[in-house]
């Protein structure tokens, strides 16, 4: 989307030299909002899966089995839960919408809260498991924090929830052996 018709024409002319797919003509405001919408939608979908994992943990239900069964319905496609949301797009872009439209973006705002909380929750789970191990075995556990990046095959740790989890675990470890592994 360009600032006006002429700039849109120039952009399409430029990108059509190397883009194989369809180039869609729109204005710059809609184009920007489209990118924010794509990333916010993903954030909301991830938050739903993460919220289910929190509920299932308290209810004693295997979240993986639950999602697998629910996804057998033809109109259901629940994502897999994780330790939050990372990266410079999905974890950040929703804030552009919520800052400009706070009253209208309740679901987007809540999704950010859920996904941010999930990293805190995971850190607490690891800390509690470490404490339990130490009490039962009278020695400090050896911990491997594996996969700090927010997705496979990248070296980008921006907004990675695993980075937060690792920091919190290291702060509470009292000299436990912690190995940080990024394959």
Spell out what each predicted region is.
Residues 1-183:
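Structural/interface elements that position substrates and couple domains in central-metabolism enzymes
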């Amino acid at each position: 989307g360009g600032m006006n018709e002429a700039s849109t024409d120039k952009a399409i002319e430029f990108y059509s030299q190397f883009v194989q797919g369809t180039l869609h003509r729109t204005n710059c405001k809609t184009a920007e909002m489209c990118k924010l919408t794509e990333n916010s939608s993903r954030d909301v979908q991830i938050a739903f899966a993460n919220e289910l994992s929190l509920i299932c943990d308290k209810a004693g239900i295997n979240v993986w089995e639950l999602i697998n069964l629910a996804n057998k319905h033809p109109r259901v496609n629940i994502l897999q839960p994780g330790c939050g949301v990372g990266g410079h797009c999905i974890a950040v872009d929703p804030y552009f919408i919520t800052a400009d439209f706070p009253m209208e973006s309740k679901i987007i705002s809540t999704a950010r809260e859920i996904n941010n909380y999930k990293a805190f929750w995971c850190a607490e789970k690891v800390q509690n498991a470490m404490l339990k191990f130490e009490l039962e075995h009278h020695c400090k556990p050896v911990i491997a924090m594996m996969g700090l990046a927010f997705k496979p095959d990248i070296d980008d740790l921006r907004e990675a929830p695993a980075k937060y989890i690792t920091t919190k675990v290291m702060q509470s470890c009292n000299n436990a052996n912690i190995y940080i592994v990024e394959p």
